[in-house]
């Protein structure tokens, strides 16, 4: 069991120990400011001088180019309680250097900015007494005590940061209490009453550490079978039936993840990037589904991408590999979301359930156990032996709607199994509970979307209210515009922050040359500045003319600035790939970088181009 921690920072480094009331565990963790790194000391070596700071959790340690740092969760807020366990969301973080008041160079400062960016944008959750990385069903199999040793590595977000601590813990079990697995996603519960039965309804979403990243920089599958934007979402329910004196606990798992083939959308400043497909991905796809079958059993694949236009090649590529696998445990269904739900008839998504039932999916396939008043398991009534894996292009907006509808369908059967709702009645008649349910799923949708796309989810008006509205459509327009800006100009650093935090890039083992300087040709770097200058001149001639706007001098400036603006903008969009803010730490896989030279073979800069391993679908059918 873990708990709050205190630390002292001085000239010798940072010293950590458990807060008071933790029994006989007197271990002190010392993150030294020299090459010794992490050490385990006795209680007598905890500093008696210096400010003692109490924190919620130690997320772990990271070594950058020059120094080591502790990543700390300072403050938290409670987001839920379930069967006696409290869920917390991290509110405030700190990055503490081992070198007290030390100066750092510009490269080290950039790495620290990336860490701060990741901590600022992320939603981290944990529980001192419950393992949030595992589902209720998996936790039942590994035992009641929360421990990093049984945590699911896929969702152990600070797995890399705790590497030193985990190595020590293999020899010294006292260190276990310092290792707090954290998930990135969503975790919240709400209390309600349904037909005089007290219930707790909750939602937990866990983002995978493998192939993690942003919308356009982590698509498809990698050679190890990991896919972009993979999330496991668990709907949990506790119902205390006063008549039978039984406490029922339920769990229903769903997954989402990018289409498991080699594909990408290459940003080029256009609203729809260039869609490209990679080489034969059958082996990687097989690895992905072999993993999913081992973890979840039968997989029901719900594909929501459009069947024409820009998205068609992805649909066809997915169906091709599923057909080639010919696996009896893989059940594929295509649902034309935009056609079936056209004109905002989003209730028609329930037609998908009919398709899934014909393939063999049952709303009785969930985990169900009975516990006593102390929270101990009395009986395992049922286990979940399959999973619905949903995807659209981004695995965000359409996917959110479908997952919430499926979970609503299963929740009805869970209430019936606990004798809370009679067969033939519906729990949706309870308006406060329905509102809580819809808000849980809408907030979850936003959390998943912000992590991947940088904005809240689209279509959450349907998830939140059960119907599509014009205001919701307008909010979707604003979010889409924000996504366009972020995906082209701010997601590069955000992807770098993922790769740095998760250990995909380790500065202390990297080359001497800093990855951060802009090495594009000078004229490429100047174009945005020229556009800004032209816009400034245009604004001045319109709003602050020296004489009147139609004076010859003013019109000359206006015409000149307009020509410069038009030519510069045309050049920029024609060569859009050169102006995207690409990640700098880890290769995205679908790009190659070329060195350019002048006639004297002097280096002029770096240019980006599409990798020859990827090609544009031909022909690409359009609307």
UniProtKB/Swiss-Prot annotation:
Any one biological process term the GO annotation gives: intracellular sphingolipid homeostasis
Catalytic activity of the protein: a 1,2-diacyl-sn-glycero-3-phospho-(1D-myo-inositol-3-phosphate) + H2O = a 1,2-diacyl-sn-glycero-3-phospho-(1D-myo-inositol) + phosphate; a 1,2-diacyl-sn-glycero-3-phospho-(1D-myo-inositol 4-phosphate) + H2O = a 1,2-diacyl-sn-glycero-3-phospho-(1D-myo-inositol) + phosphate
Numbered residues of crosslink Glycyl lysine isopeptide (Lys-Gly) (interchain with G-Cter in ubiquitin): 246, 358
Location in or out of the cell: Endoplasmic reticulum membrane; Golgi apparatus membrane
First-listed, main subcellular location of the protein, grouped into a coarse class: endoplasmic reticulum
Spans through the membrane: 524-544, 553-573
Note, other: Present with 48000 molecules/cell in log phase SD medium.
Subunit and interaction comment: Component of the SPOTS complex, at least composed of LCB1/2 (LCB1 and/or LCB2), ORM1/2 (ORM1 and/or ORM2), SAC1 and TSC3.
Protein's recorded name: Phosphatidylinositol-3-phosphatase SAC1
Species in which this protein is naturally found: Saccharomyces cerevisiae (strain ATCC 204508 / S288c)
Record lineage: Eukaryota, Fungi, Dikarya, Ascomycota, Saccharomycotina
């Amino acid at each position: 069991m873990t708990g709050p921690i205190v630390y002292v920072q001085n000239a010798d480094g940072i010293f950590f120990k458990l807060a008071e009331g933790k029994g006989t565990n007197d271990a002190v963790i010392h993150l030294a400011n020299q090459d010794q790194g992490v050490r385990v000391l006795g209680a007598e070596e905890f500093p008696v001088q210096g400010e003692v700071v109490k924190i919620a959790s130690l997320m772990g340690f990271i070594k950058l180019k020059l120094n080591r740092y502790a990543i700390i969760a300072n403050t938290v807020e409670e987001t839920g309680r379930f069967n006696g366990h409290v869920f917390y969301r991290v509110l405030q973080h700190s990055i503490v250097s081992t070198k007290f008041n030390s100066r750092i160079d510009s490269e080290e400062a950039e790495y620290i900015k990336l860490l701060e960016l990741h901590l600022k944008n992320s939603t981290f959750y944990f529980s001192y007494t419950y393992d949030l990385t595992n589902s209720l069903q998996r936790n039942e199999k590994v035992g009641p005590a929360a421990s990093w040793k049984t945590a699911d590595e896929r969702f152990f977000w600070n797995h890399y940061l705790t590497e030193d601590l985990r190595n020590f813990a293999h020899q010294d079990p006292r260190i276990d209490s310092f290792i707090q697995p954290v998930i990135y996603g969503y975790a919240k519960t709400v209390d309600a009453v349904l037909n005089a039965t007290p219930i707790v309804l909750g939602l937990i979403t866990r983002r995978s550490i493998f192939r993690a990243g942003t919308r356009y920089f982590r698509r498809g599958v990698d050679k190890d079978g990991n896919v972009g934007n993979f999330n496991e979402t668990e709907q949990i329910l506790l119902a205390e039936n006063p008549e039978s004196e039984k406490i029922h606990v339920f769990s229903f798992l769903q997954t989402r993840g990018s289409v498991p083939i080699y594909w990408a959308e290459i940003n080029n400043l256009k609203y729809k990037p260039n869609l490209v497909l990679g080489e034969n991905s059958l082996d990687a796809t097989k690895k992905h589904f072999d993993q999913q079958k081992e973890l979840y059993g039968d997989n029901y694949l719900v594909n929501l991408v459009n069947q024409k236009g820009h998205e068609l090649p992805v649909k066809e590529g997915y169906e091709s590999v599923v057909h080639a696998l010919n696996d009896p445990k893989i059940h594929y269904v295509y649902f034309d979301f935009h056609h079936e739900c056209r004109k905002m008839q989003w209730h028609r998504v329930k037609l998908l359930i009919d398709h899934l039932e014909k393939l063999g999916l049952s709303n009785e396939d969930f985990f169900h156990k009975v516990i006593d008043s102390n929270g101990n398991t009395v009986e395992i009534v049922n286990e979940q032996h399959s999973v619905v894996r949903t995807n659209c292009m981004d695995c965000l907006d359409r996917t959110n709607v479908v997952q919430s509808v499926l979970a609503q369908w299963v929740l009805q059967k869970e209430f019936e199994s606990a004798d809370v709702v009679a067969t033939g009645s519906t729990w949706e008649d309870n308006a406060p509970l329905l509102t809580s349910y819809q808000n849980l799923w809408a907030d979850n949708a936003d959390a998943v979307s912000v992590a991947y796309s940088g904005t809240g989810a689209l279509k959450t008006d349907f998830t939140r209210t059960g119907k599509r509205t014009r205001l919701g459509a307008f909010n979707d327009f604003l979010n889409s515009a924000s996504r366009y800006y972020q995906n082209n100009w701010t997601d590069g650093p955000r992807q770098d922050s993922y790769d740095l935090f998760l250990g995909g890039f380790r500065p202390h083992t990297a080359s001497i040359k800093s990855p951060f300087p802009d090495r594009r040709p000078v004229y490429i770097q100047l174009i945005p500045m020229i556009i800004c200058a032209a816009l400034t001149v245009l604004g001045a001639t319109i709003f602050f003319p020296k004489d009147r706007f139609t004076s010859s001098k003013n019109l000359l400036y206006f015409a000149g600035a307009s020509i410069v603006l038009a030519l510069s903008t045309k050049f920029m969009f024609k060569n859009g790939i050169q102006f995207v803010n690409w990640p700098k730490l880890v290769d995205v896989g679908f790009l190659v970088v070329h060195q350019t030279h002048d006639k004297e073979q002097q280096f002029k800069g770096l240019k980006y181009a599409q990798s020859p391993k990827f090609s544009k679908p031909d022909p690409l059918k359009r609307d």
